[in-house]
Amino acid sequence: GTYGYPTPAVKKIESYYDVPEGVDIRGRYDAEFAKILTKDALKFVADLQREFRNHIKYALECRREAKKKYNEGALPEFDPATTYIREQEWVCAPVPPAVADRKVEITGPVDRKMVINALNSGAKVFMADFEDALSPGWENLMRGQVNLKDAVAGTISLHDKARNRVYKLNDQTAKLFVRPRGWHLPEAHILIDGEPATGCLVDFGLYFYHSYSAFRRTQGAGFGPFFYLPKMEHSREAKIWNNVFEKAEKVAGIERGSIRATVLIETLPAVFQMNEILYELKDHSVGLNCGRWDYIFSYVKTFQAHPDRLLPDRVLVGMTQHFMKSYSDLLIRTCHRRGVHAMGGMAAQIPIKEDPVANEVALELVRKDKLREVKAGHDGTWAAHPGLIPACMEIFNNNMGNASNQIDTVKREDGANITEQDLLQIPRGARTMEGLRLNTRVGIQYVAAWLTGSGSVPLYNLMEDAATAEISRVQNWQWLKYGVELNGDGLGVKVNKELFGRVVEEEMARIEKEVGTEKFKEGMYKEACKIFTRQCTSPMLDDFLTLDAYNYIVVHHPRETSKL
């Protein structure tokens, strides 16, 4: 089969998905899923795929070209060809009233209980995630679609028998944004004209098709649906999204500019394209967001062939590092100049119930970080756990008066002087054995959870998603490739394969001790260790860990589940 996935044997069975011409479903049949995978909804997805697949292939080809240039020594830069877009005065369409106030946004995967709790959390926005917080197996994706459809309809509920509790929506809920996958991820359970569908078009298309009408009536107050767009590297990728939105609006018969999206600036090339990205999405934009971990991951990836740009321990690469501060300042200036939200980054801390002292220390860190954001001019921020919402909300409320946002009040004209050198400045700090160990034990545990269906994983009192595993593996890769000296702990040890092998062995023993032998045997820790270690030691750096690990979770049903 395509991409070396097994080609299923054709056997007729009683229940199958009713599919349009050219669409073939290889995921398990389920009557609930069939309400999502209707013939019309699949036709909508297939039409998007057919119209845009060549543009998507071209955009991904351009990513490879850019990578080649960086590997030959080039640095990312502002594009001279689009100077006029950066210099002219223009603004995006006005912000829809329903989402003027986004002071605190909670993020999380699309499982049923999470969706209910997040919508009820008291945050202004819930970003329901099909991307880094979700392991994209068939069941997770399709259940997620069912959950969002029910959430928008207002009917979502859950009876937790173990706790004897019924979960349902409050009268007041957060506004729903949905984050589809990035352009590079395939959906191997749905074939269109014999090729795997583009993951994000499946995520976007199925959700939009079933929910746009109810969403605009309720949540969006005449606008919407709302989206978050991940991992873009260039404005040409934003242009494809803009065209997808316009096509969807046309098919649905809703006004142009109804659909709105916030773009995550979480790759190094994209920071030089912020004006251009907003310009492409002018009628469909509701701002940009700082995706910190992925941005650092992208810094390492972009400079994989530049030994002069080694990172210190990742815990030291905070927002106060010059290149990170420059990135967030430029993002705020750009968004406010163009009339849209500049969203702050993630607070990943999880409340530590069993240790009030440690909990207070963690909360203090969150408060400090959020205070920095609101003072810099951010309009809102992210939290991974509902327990952080009150602290974040308080900081933003106290520092913004009664305003919904700071778009008109904090212009950050000083951001006009931020240069390419500022954005690329090499971060300072030491490299330590503990840095290498932490990357290894967190990376392996994250991949193990991902392989067993969890994409959002609590580890050492932080809520981790795929971005953490990515930065962990590329940093290990970089240190190994260049044999860096661990200068931070006075031992002067150089990182090499032998040392890394020993670290992996010791960290695996530590993980087993921490999770218990039983769980260690049941979990996919050995497989995860193989994948993670291979990624850290391979001669060439893989673009995405999730792309490599995806092959392990694709399950093609041997029975044919859609009629030919």
Swiss-Prot record:
Coiled coil: none annotated. Pfam families: MS_C, MS_N, MS_TIM-barrel. It catalyses: glyoxylate + acetyl-CoA + H2O = (S)-malate + CoA + H(+). Its main location: other. One of its GO terms (biological process) is glyoxylate cycle. InterPro entries: Malate_synth_C_sf, Malate_synth_sf, Malate_synthA, Malate_synthase_CS, Malate_synthase_TIM, MS_C, MS_N, MS_N_TIM-barrel_dom. The keyword tRNA-binding does not apply. GO terms for molecular function: malate synthase activity. Its EC number is 2.3.3.9. Gene3D superfamilies: Malate synthase, domain 3, Malate synthase, domain III. One of its GO terms (cellular component) is cytoplasm. The active site is at residues 179, 465. Keywords: Glyoxylate bypass, Glyoxysome, Peroxisome, Transferase, Tricarboxylic acid cycle. It is found in: Glyoxysome. Pathway: Carbohydrate metabolism; glyoxylate cycle; (S)-malate from isocitrate: step 2/2. A motif (Microbody targeting signal) lies at residues 562-564. Belongs to the malate synthase family. This is Malate synthase, glyoxysomal. The lineage of its organism: Eukaryota, Viridiplantae, Streptophyta, Embryophyta, Tracheophyta.
